[in-house]
Amino acid sequence: MTASSVTSSRTGARVERLPLARFTTLGVGGEAEVWFVDNHEQLAEALEQPYRILGGGSNLVVADEGVPERVIRLTGRLAAADLTPDPDLSSTETVVTGWVGGGVPLPGLIRRLQKLGLSNLEGTVGIPAQVGGAVWMNAGTRYGEMFDGLHTLEIVSPEGMRQVTPDELDWGYRRSGIPRGHVVTRVRLKLRRSTPEAVLAKMALADQARKGQPKMKTPGCAFKNPGGVSAGKLIDEAGLKGTRIGNAMIAPEHGNFIVNLGGASSRDIHALLALIRARVGVPLELEYELWPEQA
């Protein structure tokens, strides 16, 4: 398949060879065969060959050479959100929604919940992710994370589909416990009834915490905080803020962010990550996902 050629799979999925840089918040990444799947039937076909799932493209560094696997994007029915309260599961204090697709953009979902006065997920405001990816890594901030508002998860793999509750998963800080290779296709949310004003006030707190973050193209935080210590503070103390390699730089505003100055390569990013690990005095666990994975 040549670049930008469009075909249709046997189930009607749109298949196109595209540069992955256009789908990532870093703006880096070579070409791959991208499958846009609208429903479970198309997804099942896409899973017949080696694959990767691409959501909002944050927390991701893709190699300049791209990846050989199919790259799957959830669209159509798998990017729709039914926020209608389930009358059998909701109460005067809580709401359990209908199904929310893994391809739903998280920022738009948070805005809808705020207008409805539904609380529990406002701490994730500003995270440029889709619901499936945000759930898969339990994205969040100091003010809240995705598992604060989950009732049921629908996950799919080549072996089939199953529904699980958060209690069935070994989830924690920036991890869901969902096995690698499984796709978060849909979730049902469990939310607390509040008011639009109260939810907006909590969103403002999380927004304020982001004021010191860079505005340039970035995957987000590079490393998880080790043992409750700020990774950004450790990088700052190592004197690395503002360090540049090629067209990538450790952000002057916040040491735990790497930014694309324009035309950065994945090699630039990897070189900065290696430099940080060499200079910081404690082991750092990467928060980014690397495509392909590094040995």
UniProtKB/Swiss-Prot annotation:
Domain of life: Bacteria
Localization terms from the record: Cytoplasm
UniProt cofactor(s): FAD
GO cellular component, one term: cytosol
Active-site residues (renumbered): R174, C221, E287
EC number(s) per entry: 1.3.1.98
Record PANTHER family: UDP-N-ACETYLENOLPYRUVOYLGLUCOSAMINE REDUCTASE (PTHR21071:SF4)
Function: Cell wall formation.
Stated family: Belongs to the MurB family.
Annotated protein name in UniProt: UDP-N-acetylenolpyruvoylglucosamine reductase
Gene (name only): murB
